Amino acid sequence: MNKKPLMLVALLCALPTLNALAKSEPQNVLTLKQALKNTEQQNLQLKRYPYHQKILTALKSQAALSPNPELSFEAENFLGTHGSHAFSGAQYTLALSQLIELGDKRQNRINYATANIKAQTIEYKNTRLALLATTAERYYQVLKFQALIALNSERKNTVKQALNAIEKRAKAGAVSSADVTRMRYALSQVDLNTAMLQSEFERSRLALNELWQEVKVSDYYAGDLSQIAAIKSEAALLDVINTAPEFALLQQQYMQKTANLALQRSSGQSDLTLGGGVRYNQQTDASSFVFSFSMPLQLSNANGGNIEAAQHQLALLNEQQGQLRIQLRKQIRTLYAYYHGKSTQAQLLTQRVIPQAQTLIKQSLKSYQQGQISVLQLLDAQQALFDSKRALINTHSELYQVLLTLERLTGQPLIETHQS
């Protein structure tokens, strides 16, 4: 039997092991847990939140302020004629007045400012959750391309070893030059695929770094796409709709608009101004007390338009809550069905397709040793295995994307970050 085909067979069989031994330990490793921590600490959008909180807190302090009293001085009957010559007949009035707010205006301002702070807090939580989900999505994209590059590197080494063996056999006249050309073309295709994957890997890595203020360069991204936790039942996911981030924000906005309606109604009520002071008559050398009372005549509600607008805003939010509940239920059902479809594909690839591809390689190796098939047919069998592994990586990546979308919608943790 020819020893050269046996050498090629041995190389094809031993290559994955040699590949694993050749890998060096990465020096700069990034984990998903660290990536999420980087987002919490360095994301510019999250860093702006404390300033928004300080602004709203200051506005609440402003809302709690009551009107200041007003001091007035009045002089009359001076620099006139006859008895009002010069200041001989002048009258002086020193008075103090105070605006008294009616309709609980001050308390309604405080309630509205408090509702704004709570809405801002919920909005921050939703923004934080969305950014963490985006971080995880981009991290798993990096993991996917990292795994595909490793798989393609394994494939390239296999093709190179086969090319070397075929070139030696071609020199001996055992195979045609067309077989050598075809193998070189296959190697070029692998190189092209590697370049494309490297470009996508770099793009996904830079997209992950966009979330952080400081650039974090890593040699290796830790994680195993095949480790996917069991998803909760569809009923359990539907039960948490009322606590979903978007729904919680709408509920707080409803409370916010309710407080605004109360404020607009109280603003439509007239306020009372009371005043009192002392009056001195220069001509008679007499002093007396004065008292004043004033209130606008409420012929019409001066704030009627704002009240009506606030009522319509409440009705709109109430309608949006109902629509959002229906929309979330539909999205969760769709994603849940899609997840199970992809899970079935992953199981088929793991339990049937890949094992059958491995069996095909063993049978092809045996047939090649017996001279029944060409080396190109043997490599086709090897390509089938790599295609199956690539499909499994892509399927696992899609499963993670579905889980992260469900996390974003429900606010429930579905992925264990410590696994990486």
Describe each PLM feature range.
Residues 3, 23-25, 33, 393-420:
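Acidic, low-complexity, intrinsically disordered peripheral segments
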Residues 37-47, 54-68, 83, 94-111, ...:
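A glycine-/polar-enriched beta->alpha junction
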Residues 110-114, 177-186, 375-383:
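Short, charged, amphipathic alpha-helical segments
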Residues 48-60, 127, 131-152, 161, ...:
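Amphipathic alpha-helical coiled-coil segments
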Residues 2-5, 127-243, 335-338, 342:
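Periplasmic alpha-helical coiled-coil/stalk elements that build and connect Gram-negative outer-membrane
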Residues 23-28, 72-109, 221-230, 273-308, ...:
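Small/polar, glycine/serine/threonine/aspartate-rich low-complexity segments that form flexible
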Residues 1-21:
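Gram-negative bacterial Sec-dependent N-terminal signal peptides
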Residues 20-70, 75, 99-100, 108, ...:
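Bacterial Sec-pathway N-terminal export signals of envelope proteins
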